[in-house]
């Protein structure tokens, strides 16, 4: 969309959140509220995005990418004042769309409709509105018939005006040239002593300019988030949207009430999500995989046909047709090739496990390279840390480690080798070798343990 720009209001302090974090940085479905709005703008191909910052500027600015321009509002003197700071940056821009950084539930299709109406009617301004049964605290849209008159804020409205149910969402399209002139005519003469952006509509009306409205059917898009309770309510709406989307895309979700999927997750058709599954970050799950129950995956990749149950995974890669869990813990740097089995009470960290290898139960594998078709017996651990440095363990293809083997890194187990149960291996084992390390078993006859009387 040439000659368009978006201006996102994000300068407010968010006092009711009672947080050191700026309001628009609180997350919804795994992303900051502000990022939801930015992503929505970019999905409708608006080429420029400007964010007006004030409180918490440094924290917010540090999270923005190079595509986002920052406009600073040093003093928060109202929405009109915020736009006054942005207008000088609108070089070669014919129209702007103004949004609020604390309204993360706005949808791309709504913005497209708003922009379409604005262009079709060659309007000076087009407002996004919504109808609430209880619009308490929200600015009202005043009309004469279908003709827009003005917006009145709750604190400045008469008792009769407060009965109006159509409200101002705070999202607008403006003709930049006309907005620039109208801003010269607004003053802070209101109950708050601020420059209201909404006062430009009265200026437009007096000048006979075209003002249009578009009423969204989804009132959730108008929800501004000012408290933790409102954030929780918005989280529920976002979660239901995400769940509905993936079910429409061919994903089976056994119990939507107990399933949580963040916005950055990608799922393929015929994935099955069991109850109490939580998928976070950039997690990707391929077709026919079954996740859960009671599984949390963050920034993980799961291959086709794998089964992952009662597992916590973070920044792990799981190949195709693997079996993981129950009660496995996959830490960052874990890479499992196809057909790997990781069983109960197994922890893996920063390790590569080759195709067809098995770690069935009660093991810790850290900083290791494990080959193909390896069997790691119950209770086997890699001793990879000396209190200062981490060391690597290498286990070659087809090795068989007996139960309760301790591998003192750095150490290498050769291809096809076997370790005896209970061995502590601290030296490299050649290929096709049996390695046993045990102290001599002693029997003390006629020994009876002293008992306290």
UniProtKB/Swiss-Prot annotation:
Binds 1 Mg(2+) ion per subunit. Acetyl-CoA binds at residues 378, 384-385, 403, 421, 438. It holds the Pfam family NTP_transf_3. Its main location: cytoplasm. One of its GO terms (cellular component) is membrane. InterPro entries: Bifunctional_GlmU, GlmU-like, GlmU_C_LbH, Hexapep, MobA-like_NTP_Trfase, Nucleotide-diphossugar_trans, Trimer_LpxA-like_sf. UDP-N-acetyl-alpha-D-glucosamine binds at residues 23, 73, 78-79, 100-102, 139, 153, 168, 226, 331, 349, 364, 375. It catalyses: alpha-D-glucosamine 1-phosphate + acetyl-CoA = N-acetyl-alpha-D-glucosamine 1-phosphate + CoA + H(+); N-acetyl-alpha-D-glucosamine 1-phosphate + UTP + H(+) = UDP-N-acetyl-alpha-D-glucosamine + diphosphate. Its EC number is 2.7.7.23, 2.3.1.157. CDD domains: GT2_GlmU_N_bac (cd02540), LbH_GlmU_C (cd03353). Residues 229-249 are annotated as: Linker. Homotrimer. This is Bifunctional protein GlmU. It comes from Desulfitobacterium hafniense (strain Y51).
């Amino acid at each position: 969309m040439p000659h368009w720009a978006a201006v996102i209001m994000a300068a407010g302090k968010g006092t009711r959140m009672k947080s050191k974090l700026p309001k628009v940085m609180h997350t919804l479905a795994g992303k900051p509220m502000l990022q939801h709005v930015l992503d929505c703008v970019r999905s409708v191909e608006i080429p420029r995005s400007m964010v007006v910052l004030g409180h918490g500027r440094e924290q917010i600015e540090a999270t923005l990418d190079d595509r986002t321009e920052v406009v600073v509002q040093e003093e928060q003197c109202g929405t009109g004042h915020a736009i006054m700071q942005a207008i000088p940056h609108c070089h070669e821009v014919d129209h702007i769309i103004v949004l609020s950084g604390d309204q993360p539930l706005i949808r791309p299709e709504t913005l497209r409709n708003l922009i379409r109406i604005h262009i079709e009617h060659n309007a000076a301004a087009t407002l996004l509105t919504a109808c609430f049964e209880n619009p308490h605290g929200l600015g009202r849209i005043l009309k004469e018939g279908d003709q827009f008159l003005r917006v009145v804020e709750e604190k400045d409205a008469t008792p009769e005006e407060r009965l109006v149910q159509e409200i101002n969402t705070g999202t607008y399209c403006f003709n930049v040239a006309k907005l620039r002139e109208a801003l010269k005519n607004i003053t802070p003469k209101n109950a708050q002593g601020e420059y209201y952006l909404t006062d430009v509509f009265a200026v437009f009306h007096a000048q006979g300019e075209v003002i249009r409205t578009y009423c969204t059917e989804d009132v959730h898009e108008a929800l501004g988030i000012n408290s933790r309770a409102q954030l929780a309510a918005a989280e529920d709406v976002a979660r239901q949207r995400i769940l509905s989307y993936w079910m429409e895309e061919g994903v089976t979700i056994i119990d939507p009430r107990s399933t949580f999927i963040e916005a950055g997750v990608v799922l393929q058709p015929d994935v099955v999500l069991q109850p109490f599954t939580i998928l976070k970050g950039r997690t990707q799950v391929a077709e026919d995989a079954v996740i859960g129950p009671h599984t949390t995956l963050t920034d993980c990749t799961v291959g086709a046909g794998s089964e992952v149950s009662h597992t916590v995974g973070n920044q792990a890669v799981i190949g195709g047709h693997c079996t993981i869990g129950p009660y496995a813990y996959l830490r960052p740097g874990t890479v499992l090739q196809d057909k790997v089995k990781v069983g109960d009470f197994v922890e893996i960290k920063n390790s590569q496990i080759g195709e067809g290898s098995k770690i069935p139960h009660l093991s810790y594998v850290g900083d290791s390279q494990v080959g193909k078709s390896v069997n790691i017996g119950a209770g086997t651990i890699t001793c990879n840390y000396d209190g200062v440095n981490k060391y690597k363990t290498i286990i070659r293809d087809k090795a068989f480690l007996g139960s309760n083997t301790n591998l003192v890194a750095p150490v290498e187990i050769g291809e096809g080798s076997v370790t005896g149960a209970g061995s502590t291996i601290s030296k490299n084992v050649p290929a096709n070798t049996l390695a046993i390390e045990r102290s001599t078993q002693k029997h003390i006859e006629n020994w009876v343990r002293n008992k306290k009387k």
